[in-house]
Design a protein with these regions (language model features):
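A conserved acidic, glycine/proline-rich C-terminal tail/linker
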Residues: 180-259
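N-terminal glycine-/serine-/threonine-rich phosphate-binding loop
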Residues: 1-76
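Structural motif
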Residues: 2-5, 31-34, 63-66, 79-81, ...
Length: 273
């Protein structure tokens, strides 16, 4: 049975997601459908990629991921259908594909959406193309080869000999703050040295915890979460709200001076001794 995931920024307050599921089951009756989320930001691609990737990687190889984010940023004359690392991805041609994967896949076809004007008309063409692919196992049945895609890539931490600087990419519902520094990057750069995590100018953390319970209630902590990313939090509190931290916004960053407090608060720095 084929597994198809749905991810979007649409929400679930109206009929759209239900209609798309109906299209899938009417065309591919054996499909198993799984929702990843329908509450991604339409503007913060890096945050959306973090959420999507850390769910999608747990699905079996062969899964088809239909990702509908910022769908109408450009006129949708086509959507992309790509293969990467055993998984298949359907996305608008708006840069989100490369933001998710971090690379441009070698295998990409475009699904022709000309003549489709509404969201449901476009998803009907998507589902038909996915069905052709699943029946044949050949991506050429879904569309024609295509390489001239929109490309946007995730920001990476900035590195110096004795420091790292990461951007806040996600704040969860408990206002725990996730930074785009992965454990393997941290360990490689730290080389076992003592460190100091610095944020909002005067706040520091000098120990990595294994879980929230390792510090007293109301104390701040840092750890590498289940996705392997650096997370700073306050046990029983709200880190982002208490310390004025906010998600990194590249557009806002470009409008601000480097010494602007808000710009600083979107960064987290690690210094090594």
């Amino acid at each position: 049975m084929p597994v198809i995931t749905l991810t979007s920024d649409i929400g679930q307050e109206d009929f759209i997601i239900g209609a798309v599921k109906g299209q899938i089951l009417s065309t591919i009756p054996t499909a198993t459908i799984a929702d990843i989320t329908h509450y991604l930001s339409s503007k913060n691609y890096q945050q959306g990629a973090y959420i999507f990737n850390n769910a999608a990687k747990h699905f079996p190889k062969g899964t088809v991921h239909i990702v509908m984010v910022n769908f109408f940023q450009f006129p949708q004359e086509h959507v992309l259908f790509a293969h990467y690392n055993g998984h298949f991805f359907v996305t608008p041609d708006n840069g989100f594909l490369t933001m998710m994967l971090g690379v441009k896949p070698l295998e990409i076809v475009k699904i022709n959406c000309k003549g489709a004007h509404t969201f449901i008309q476009i998803t009907e063409k998507i589902v038909e193309s996915v069905a052709y692919f699943l029946a044949s196992g050949n991506m050429a049945e879904a569309g024609e080869p295509f390489t001239d895609i929109q490309e946007i890539y995730p920001m990476q931490p900035t590195l110096g000999p004795n420091w790292m600087e990461g951007q806040i990419l996600f704040i969860d519902q408990f206002e725990n703050v996730v930074v785009n520094i992965r454990k393997e990057e941290f360990d490689l750069h730290a080389k076992g040295r003592p460190f100091k995590i610095v944020f909002t100018r005067n706040e520091t953390i000098e120990v990595l915890s294994k879980h929230y319970g390792e510090v007293p209630v109301a104390d701040k902590l840092a750890w590498f979460n289940s996705a392997g990313y650096l997370e700073i939090a306050v046990r029983g509190g709200n880190m982002a709200g208490l310390f004025g931290l906010s998600k990194y916004d590249e557009n806002q960053h470009n409008k601000q001076r480097p010494n602007d407090n808000k710009w600083f608060f979107q960064m987290v720095r690690v210094f090594f001794e």
